[in-house]
Amino acid sequence: KKTQNWLTLLVKAVAMEPNSDQLHHSLALAYMAQNENDKAIEHMGKALALNSKKDSYYFELGALMEKAGDYKGAMENMRLAIELNPLHSNAHNFLGYMYALEGHDLDQALVHLKKALTTQPRNGYFLDSLGWIYFKKGESEKALTQIQKAMIYTDPDPVLFDHLGDILFSLKNYDEASGAWKNSLFLTENPKGNLGGEFPDPRILKNKIDKARNLMQQSY
């Protein structure tokens, strides 16, 4: 209810001061909190039209576009954020991780992650992204090192455990891979705290666990 009241006030404020980029930005964030993504994108775009020198606006618009499935638009806005602020570690991480998810430009993805980690060397999510890039490059041992390091600096996270399972599986460590996926499944089905809303698909996790179990049985 407090968020809804705040949203109502911001709508009135924007109507009174339509040329305030800060008010449009605040309204976009309020819509984001209400999961009204289209309206959030609309007002973040208006904030940028009024002030195109704010790297944070480009980053937030990019994140909103990624959530909406507009990956091309998301990546373009991340690049613009980096143009304005070459040390924008979150934008570097975002771009690098998106390249890794798509499985292309992995060398460029690596460049972005190393830049992100230059400013935040103990950011567990950046280390996870770096590990995932190594995994996509077929360098599973390097990937394992980075994921294990990532887990030191983060709270238990289902996505990280899913990644850990995939990496261990690629190294034919089926027992530990199954354990990692079981942890991911538990955290997915019993969410606690703010995990950013990202969760693996439980059905896919269960299939992975079954596959690992079958391979373990075959090895006996």
Label the predicted regions.
Residues 16, 50, 84, 119, ...:
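Structural marker of alpha-solenoid helical repeat scaffolds
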Residues 29, 63, 97-98, 132, ...:
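Residue-level recognition of tetratricopeptide repeat
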